[in-house]
């Protein structure tokens, strides 16, 4: 069953963030991922407008998406982004389908 990375980012330094973003497609390809949207037009409809870049990436399975995130290559790319203060990201892994809402943690 497909699964998705859903990322929200606040880009602080576009030049440095691009260096990070340019590294990611080759990493994703190793996990069979497909970029569905990456930085296109958006409008905040609810909530605070903290983020200015949105990305949705499809993986063949939930496990492949998690493995990609924890791969050495992606960890190095993310560390570069954080070290250079290029941007702040929030990333969730979501499996396709519908289920009951989770209880509060």
Each PLM stretch: what is its role?
Residues 66, 75-93:
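C-terminal structural segments of small proteins and small subunits
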Residues 1-54, 59-70, 74, 94-105:
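Short S/T/G/P-rich N-terminal loop/turn motif that feeds into the first structured element of a domain
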């Amino acid at each position: 069953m497909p699964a998705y990375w859903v990322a929200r980012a606040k880009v602080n330094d576009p030049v440095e963030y691009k260096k990070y973003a340019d590294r990611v497609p080759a990493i994703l390809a190793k996990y069979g991922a497909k970029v569905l949207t990456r930085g296109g037009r958006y409008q905040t409809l609810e909530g605070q407008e903290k983020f200015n870049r949105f990305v949705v990436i499809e993986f063949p399975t939930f496990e492949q998406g998690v493995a990609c995130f924890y791969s050495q290559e992606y960890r190095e790319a993310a560390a570069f982004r954080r070290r250079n203060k290029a941007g702040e990201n929030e990333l969730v892994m979501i499996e396709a389908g519908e289920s009951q809402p989770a209880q509060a943690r």
